[in-house]
């Protein structure tokens, strides 16, 4: 019978030991291993050795352990420092173990029942007053005390230690030194080639930079749209009507990604006569080119020569581009011209603007000169001011038609005498 038990133990050792790693959880240490030790129910295989660890320094304990590579486990009796005290004696030959906090409860995974207690301790070299902290750590596991209190005489003299407090499982390990890790990491970084360090820095800078991408722009919103044209659109010379460049809405508020732009239109760099002409918003109708108007110094003779011919004025007003005046009114808020355009201006024809009132005061106060360049393409018309401008042109025509009757009342600046 005994031979069969020995054969069974030998087979169990052959099965468990090869490749075996002992990494129990806190619950397994308390509920299985420590509980069996307190109940005097040992295992057939000695995985945790019984040893009074306080008789040795922590750096000497790994050689006594049965298992473990970085953690070593021991059954340790809880001897009391004093006869009538529950405080254990944790003094060794080279130092002492000091608790870092209170006991932490260990709960069962099946419920909220406390099945054990865990305490953390640190080893100090030297005596209590001048001890030097080391990297050696210990976790002490023990069972909770019995709920039934015993009489004082029996507790302190006859049986000072309860069965649950008689044994503890101690896990010994050495904490990784943070200073050592910092030194190792510094030496590793310094040993890297310069190219690697440079690439790392460039990648960090690149990751912190916002990029804009034109191909990831959403559809334009209904507000804050910027209109631009494609200046590279070819133009056909055979067509009678000038081709209107394609105007596409573009919103700077609808970016979904911040990538670097690849093709971004810059209106300032491409600012020229054709670009300024096509910036004006308008309808699609084509306006004929109006004849050249006399300059400001030719107005007196022009008025005298045409005072008796009202048909010319009618033909003239029918060819006046009403949107030209509108374009002048809309030009300042639409575009800001470069410095060279502001200094030189646009050379072109002059027309009389907003002729209202009567007699010489009206004629002298409201004569203004508009200067435009040669408009070869269409100038679009703003629908909101269209009716007002047509009324102004009607007043202008009626005023010139009545010049024959008021020729004698003209001011001296419009007389034919020099």
UniProtKB/Swiss-Prot annotation:
Induction: Repressed by SMB in oriented-divised root cap stem cells. Residues 115-181 bind DNA. One of its GO terms (biological process) is root cap development. It holds the Pfam family NAM. The keyword Transcription regulation applies. InterPro entries: NAC-dom, NAC_dom_sf. One of its GO terms (molecular function) is DNA-binding transcription factor activity. Keywords: DNA-binding, Nucleus, Transcription, Transcription regulation. It is found in: Nucleus. Promotes periclinal root capforming cell divisions. Activates expression of its negative regulator SMB in a feedback loop for controlled switches in cell division plane. The NAC domain includes a DNA-binding domain and a dimerization domain. This is Protein FEZ. It comes from Arabidopsis thaliana (Mouse-ear cress).
